[in-house]
Amino acid sequence: MSNALYRGRFAPSPTGLLHAGSLSTAIGSYLEARSRGGEWLLRMEDLDPPREVPGAADDILRTLEAFGFEWDGEVVYQSRRHGLYRAALERLIASGRAYACCCTRKEIAATARRGLDGYVYPGTCRNGCPDGREGRAWRLRVDEGEWTAHDRLQGEHRQDLARDIGDFVLLRADGFWAYQLAVVVDDAEQGVTDIVRGADLLVSTPRQLAVYDALGQSAPGYCHLPVLTNAAGEKLSKQTLAPAISTRDAARQLREALAWLGHVPPADCGSLDELWPWAVANWSLSRVPAGPLQLPLS
């Protein structure tokens, strides 16, 4: 993809408002795209209504605008793209790469061992559901062997999917699309060439590579930025009660976030109109730390 126009994206989920961690990820994603003369897309990953906060999607957009982000094209909402995910799943079913699963979470927990990201599915329904039961979820049939994600900041990330993850869900039993399928379908359909996101998602990258492979698609490049943690070392998130960022004094907060990412603006860059051009001109991944960053930073 080296000869293609760089196309990045930021894809927040409206399960809460933006916090310092999501802001730093948005900044890194944006600057990597703009510093390379590329495009930056915005996608709302709103596929899990029970977890979503009413009004959060609009608030996220207002916050990004207040901080001076400028995205290319219209905002894409996953909730309006079910047909694309259904078509992809049907292709995987037709090729034998996906199969129906009737197992409940309780049944899996009773027989499976722990892996890198939850229980490793034991393959109960790989050759068909037990008699009298109908599968409601769909899983990707994972091949044996190691998958390697080449990350521009974190280096090589190797994972044996069959051993460490197992056949993973594409469509949940409750009818909601799984992240691993939707994110691949969207990035491929939108022509995303490079993904810059938080390092907490590095563990899921080999699964996405497997979906790309099963669909016959080329995978994008990856770069996983350091996550921000609280004083207890927990990733900033809704679950750890990370406070939402305020749009007041956006320039000061942008300066702080740039410093977290290894880019300290000069003292005479005081406004958003001054900070963004400086950041685009001076952005370099070589200055971004790879490991987690604990707040507050001195």
Swiss-Prot record:
Record note on cofactor: Binds 1 zinc ion per subunit.
Motif ('HIGH' region): 12-22
SUPFAM superfamilies per record: Nucleotidylyl transferase
UniProt keyword annotations, A-Z: Aminoacyl-tRNA synthetase, ATP-binding, Ligase, Metal-binding, Nucleotide-binding, Zinc
GO CC aspect terms: cytosol
Disulfide bonds: none
Keyword ATP-binding assigned: yes
Positions occupied by motif 'KMSKS' region: 235-239
Family matches, as HAMAP family: Glu_Q_tRNA_synth
NCBIfam families listed in its UniProt record: PRK05710.1-3 (NF004314), queuosine_YadB (TIGR03838)
Protein name (database record): Glutamyl-Q tRNA(Asp) synthetase
Gene from which the chain derives: gluQ
